[in-house]
Regions:
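Hydrophobic alpha-helical bundle cores within soluble ligand-binding/oligomerization subdomains
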Residues: 1-261
Length: 261
């Protein structure tokens, strides 16, 4: 049954010419979340929902097509390439990394990306899923509901914490320097992304999982500072503010090590 489902998802990775044309018109300055939002909406026009009974098929199609949508736009807007989005990778994460880098990912990268997607799926009842449910409760179609969710996740008060954490960490090449600069940020009461959680109060169990994978990737790429800086920032935030790293924090280094822009 699992094998059949994997093969089904593989068969749904292609993009229609109309969708590819739309993606080619989006500038490279666009945020990937905006690209995904638009891609989902266009897909809903090209593959219209005829009734609630086939929503599962539409959900499978979106699972397969979203990595294709993001990667096609990225490769065309940044490198002028029109890529074939139909790979033979067994996993969604492997499919995405293959399209992003133009080659089949290593077993380690494939596994890490799958773990990452699972961890982010385990995010309880948050703003984006709530937005999707509100939209669905009006008996709107599934593409509208998912588009609503993507638009909600686009907001900085909900999504983007790993991106913000990555931007912060990239400024520091030494743990000692990172501690000094972080203390300055705290003195100025500046927001430090990637810490605390609305539901978890003592720790985020997802953080422990992704942190382990970040360390493995750090060793693989012979990282000189990013993982050590991340650990120091985590320790300082716990010491100074009694705040724990959430799932987003070590995703910053994890994605950096895998070459995800």
């Amino acid at each position: 049954e699992l094998k059949d489902y994997i093969e089904k998802l593989k068969s749904l990775r292609g993009l229609q010419p109309e969708l590819r044309s739309t993606l080619e018109g989006i500038p490279k300055t666009a945020h990937p979340m905006d690209v995904l939002r638009t891609g989902c909406s266009v897909l809903g026009n090209l593959e219209q929902e005829e009734g609630f009974l086939n929503q599962t098929d539409h959900a499978d199609r979106m699972l397969s097509a979203f990595p294709s949508i993001l990667s096609y736009w990225y490769q065309f807007s940044h490198h002028g390439k029109r890529i074939d989005t139909e790979t033979n990778d067994d996993t969604i994460g492997g499919h995405f990394l293959h399209l992003l880098h133009g080659k089949k990912p290593s077993q380690l990268h494939n596994q890490v990306m799958s773990v990452s997607l699972i961890l982010y799926a385990e995010h309880e009842f948050n703003a984006s899923t709530f937005a999707a449910r509100v939209c669905a409760s009006t008996l709107s179609d599934i593409h509208s509901a998912v588009t609503s969710a993507i638009g909600t996740l686009r907001g900085p008060l909900h999504g983007g914490a790993n991106e913000a954490a990555s931007a912060m960490l990239s400024q520091w090449n030494d743990p000692d320097v990172a501690e000094v600069e972080l203390l300055k940020m705290l003195t100025k009461k500046q927001l430090v992304m990637g810490f605390g959680h609305a539901v978890y109060t003592e720790s985020d169990p997802r953080n422990e999982v992704i942190k382990q994978w970040s360390k493995k990737l750090s060793l693989e790429v012979n990282d000189k500072h990013l993982y050590d800086v991340s650990e120091r920032v985590e320790a300082v935030m716990r010491r100074e503010k009694n705040l724990f790293a959430n799932a987003d924090f070590y995703h910053a280094s994890t994605y950096e090590f895998m070459g995800i822009p």
